[in-house]
């Protein structure tokens, strides 16, 4: 689990991202599943809050996931971009997320 910003929690489990957004209307859960996320080591490439919307860019390998979350309503938009074969998210600055699977493996070790 990773606290992205106050009120937004991100959980990665195999090929699914779950966003928990606390709004004035209550807690809203949104799931994003993609085969490109399977066993992916996600990195937060950028995050910015503008006019009540969180703009989040996550990356893994050659994939970028541009995510916009309305902090008021919890609604979300996602866009997946494939980078050219000569570019990898690993070369970009950012912080890697710890997945649920990684934590389970650490506990069993």
Curated annotation (Swiss-Prot):
- Looking at the keywords, is Cell inner membrane present? no
The UniProt entry's GO biological process terms, in alphabetical order, are: symbiont-mediated suppression of host gene expression; viral process
Which Pfam family is an annotated match for this chain, by its short name? Bunya_NS-S
Q: Record keywords: Transport included? A: no
User: What organism does the record attribute this protein to?
Assistant: Bunyavirus germiston
Domain of life, per UniProt, equals: Viruses
The alphabetized UniProt keywords are: Eukaryotic host gene expression shutoff by virus, Eukaryotic host transcription shutoff by virus, Host gene expression shutoff by virus, Host-virus interaction, Inhibition of eukaryotic host transcription initiation by virus
For this entry, the protein name equals Non-structural protein NS-S
Family, as annotated: Belongs to the orthobunyavirus NS-S protein family.
What does the record give as the function of this protein?
Inhibits host transcriptional machinery, by producing modifications to the phosphorylation state of the C-terminal domain (CTD) of RNA polymerase II. Inhibits phosphorylation at serine 2 in the heptapeptide repeat (YSPTSPS) of the CTD of RNA polymerase II, suggesting that the elongation step of transcription and/or 3'-end processing is prevented. Inhibition of host transcription machinery leads to shut off of host cell protein synthesis and inhibition of the host innate immune response. NSs also seems to be involved in the nuclear relocalization of host PABP1.
């Amino acid at each position: 689990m990773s606290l992205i910003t106050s009120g937004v929690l991100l959980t990665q489990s195999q090929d699914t991202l779950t966003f928990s957004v606390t709004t004035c209307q209550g807690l809203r859960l949104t799931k994003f599943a993609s085969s490109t996320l399977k066993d992916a080591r996600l990195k937060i490439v950028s995050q910015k809050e503008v006019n009540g919307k969180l703009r989040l860019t996550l990356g893994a390998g050659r994939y970028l996931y541009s995510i916009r979350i309305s902090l008021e309503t919890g609604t979300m938009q996602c866009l997946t971009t494939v980078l050219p074969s000569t570019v990898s998210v690993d070369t970009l600055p950012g912080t890697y997320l710890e997945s649920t699977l990684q934590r389970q493996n650490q506990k069993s070790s």
